[in-house]
Swiss-Prot record:
Cofactor: binding details: Binds 6 phosphopantetheines covalently.
PANTHER family associated with the record: FATTY ACID SYNTHASE (PTHR45527:SF1), NONRIBOSOMAL PEPTIDE SYNTHETASE (PTHR45527)
Positions of the UniProt region annotated as Disordered: 961-983
Biotechnology comment: Enniatins have antimicrobial, antiviral and cytotoxic properties. The bioactivity of enniatins can be linked to their inhibition of drug efflux pumps.
Keyword Repeat in record: yes
Enzyme Commission code(s) on record: 6.3.2.-, 2.1.1.-
Protein name: Enniatin synthase
Lineage: Eukaryota, Fungi, Dikarya, Ascomycota, Pezizomycotina
Family to which the UniProt record says this protein belongs: Belongs to the ATP-dependent AMP-binding enzyme family.
Domain remark text: NRP synthetases are composed of discrete domains (adenylation (A), thiolation (T) or peptidyl carrier protein (PCP) and condensation (C) domains) which when grouped together are referred to as a single module. Each module is responsible for the recognition (via the A domain) and incorporation of a single amino acid into the growing peptide product. Thus, an NRP synthetase is generally composed of one or more modules and can terminate in a thioesterase domain (TE) that releases the newly synthesized peptide from the enzyme.
Amino acid sequence: EFNTGILKASLAYLPLDVRSPVARMKDILSSVSGNTIVIMGTGVEDPGFGLPQLELVRITDTFDETIEDVQNMSRPSATSLAYVVFTSGSTGKPKGVMIEHRAIVRLVKSDNFPNFPSPARMSHVFNAAFDGASWEMFWMLLNGGTVVCIDYLATLDGKELAAVFAKERVNCAFLAPAMLKLYLTDAREALKNLDFLAVGGEKFDPRDAAEAMTLVRGNIANVYGPTEAGMISTCYTIPKDEAFTNGVQLGRSIYNSGAYVMDPNQQLAGLGVMGEHLFGDGVGRGYTKPELNKNRFIDVTIEGKTVRAYGTGDRMRARVGDGLLEFFGRLDNQFKMRGQRIEAGEVESAMLSHKRVLNAAIVLRGGQEEGEQLEMVGFIVADDDDNTEEEETGNQVEGWQDHFESGMYSDISTAVDQSAIGNDFKGWTSMYDGNDIDKGEMQEWLDDAIHTLHNGQVPHHVLEIGTGSGMILFNLNPGLQSYVGLDPSKSAVEFVNRAIESSPKFAGKAKVHVGMATDVNKLGELHPDLVVFNSVVQYFPTPEYLTEVIDGLIAIPSVKRIFLGDIRSYATNRHFLAARAIHTLGTNNNATKDRVRQKVQELEDREEESLVEPAFFTTLKERRPDVVKHVEVIPKNMKATNELIAYRYTAVVHLRDETDEPVYPTEKDSWIDFEEKQMDKKALLDHLRLSKDAMSVAVSNITYAHTAFERRIVESLDEDSKDDAKDTLGGAAWLSAVRSETESRASLTVPELFEIANEAGFRVEVSAARQWSQNGALDAVFHHFPSSNTDRTLIQFPTDNQLRSSLTLANRPLQKLQRRRAALQVRESLQSLVPTYMVPPNIVVLDTMPLNTNGKIDRKELTRRARTLPKQQTAAPVPDFPISDIEITLCEEATEVFGMKVEISDHFFQLGGHSLLATKLISRIQHRLHVRVTVKDVFDSPVFADLAVIIRQGLAMQNPVAEGQDKQGWSSRVAPRTEVEKM
């Protein structure tokens, strides 16, 4: 009624969405000239625009106003302004489109749509600020129909919507394609009684059209038109026998709406010829800022007459034979999502307005596959927040300390039997599924670590960083004279010290202290000849931290060797992630290339441990030639197959001392490439037997059997990601093909190399120093060099030192955390500047923006990257505010953990969460709510609303309710989960 009253008064209206950011609404109102009245609905708070010539009036106040007769009120004409709608603008500001009365009259002519039902009752589901809402209202009201206004929350609930449709006898509807797709799943009953369904606002999926035709009893029309041409300008009533060639047709222009396809010279294009779609009759007056009209509102000559037209930027053609219009995409960076038109430039400008954003770009992904929604992905280059790096480093170190103290070693005194000390393997779980690693495999792993550490010698004085439960300490040779250990867990330190005191072998020789790796200088004067880090480096926060620790240790005069065991390899990490992805997805058809690619990216984004390449250690000799004599990079010598063997290695740093142990060189041209020569086990053995008199035989690029399959998986993913290739095989068939190809190529394990050497009469040294350049392959030197007093002979293997920047030799988990926070900050900023539908669900922070050969942003490359991103997990629609006491408590504790306000609809990982923060959050929840909840619960239910359900279920199991009263008194403080929450 207000809209029609405004039009009858020869005034114009401007619809606003109360859910839009105040800043955006203020921008819109500021661009409108003249006196403005803003009518507010019941319950809407005063936004405080503070603009001159602006009056705020509550709709309820107008009901009591006494209206005087207005004399000589001018009547509106066909060219009077009817309304102004603001759409996304490429300049970064919304642009207002002025629509005249004639466009409305043109639009609501009933003969535009044949078989129009009578009586007609039309659902009003569109946002009032969307121009589709004007058609819902005026088409019905001006044709004698009824408009049924439906609450926003009801439009999100299929059952509720169907109930409203049935109760109000709705028989006409106008839906955006995305809404229809939702209702085809959740509100099928609502569609069955429709005599007319119009679908428009974005591209109509023909699969949805075909399915809707099986439900809707009346006609279905595909309607099309930009805001500038009065919302709807073409219509295609879909016939029952439609074949959907080239998608759903746009049809023909409606009453008084000229629709033309023009070539670049503004001449009419012939049938079947691509061109730009222009509208003539019925176009709007123009933009509120006249300078924006250029190249959009233009004059064209049609059949000798000058016609004012609007260029849509849509790529079209008129079909040969019947002249029906067909849509083939955009000519610019404008697109539609969920019926809303979006200029990529406006979103990019909004992102660039954030102080940390240096560059920004928007691309689209999805929309091609059945049921797949079109989705925006934002890419930004952000300025590093240097002020937080030192603080984050400290937080990461403290986080691991909390993890060990309150997690892994919290129950060490009772969980580890005295007879198992040194072989307890507490906390050693598989990264594939979280289950304990087989004890036999763990024992083989430990035996190999001790054998490599001893190297045929007896270490006399040992310093260990990260004693843990004492696995290294209690397996050292009897010749040990002194041992000093450091560990961040007080519980573990007390446990090991008690075990030392009760052991005649170690009592009086060993002592463990609470401390971090950087606390060595606090231990007083030390004289270790061997320093041990075993399975510790991954917990260091940054490469710089690791460098600082190593530099401090090599400065101790007595140190001869630094043993760094169980290092997670950065070079082969993608192989490992591929293995985890396939394990998660299964070997059936779920493991398609796209899903594996996305899962790999998801796992990589969640990584919180430090991964280091071998070159990080081999470059120590170049960086400190005065101190470092040699660096070995040694793969695990084990028969078992698990992630500890396949994706970890040992680095042994030998420092210069008075001993004269030689390091044997290898000639660059003497290496035989195992893969290039297509060798196998037999061919290698034969070659060695023929070379039995040689001092050494160097073989490079030996495919590592433990990772060969995963390596080929990654190669296959990379091959396809370089272009737009689609999966030609299902998941199971693809994996089977890769496995067959892997099995057709020869590969070897480290034990097999030792067996071959033994059979051929050689000794062998194996190196993993070139994991990066050789894609995980190994080097081996079979030799007859003179034996020394050690098990291994030092050989100068080739390295990757010259091929890599030092910045790429390790990952930076803290940097990922900072980037996630930067993305979160930009998202929060966007939410205050643009409507929700313009906020990309995925915002990715890049080091640099990729450029094409013209020096412009390479959007094709960004689109390729966007395809690999994991789909964001989101909760079902729930209010942002917590409802129950449990949710309030959860949000409070999460806010403390993250240091920022957390809402119940937030996602743990999208906020930058990882297992350390999960451990901290769980600890706080357990203390506050006295409920058993695990880190796995957080990982399985990362949306806080879903996690609250898990907590509620845990409380219910612990404290069954008797006669409405929880044993812990929680029933008085915890409200039952509401229907809104469940929705």
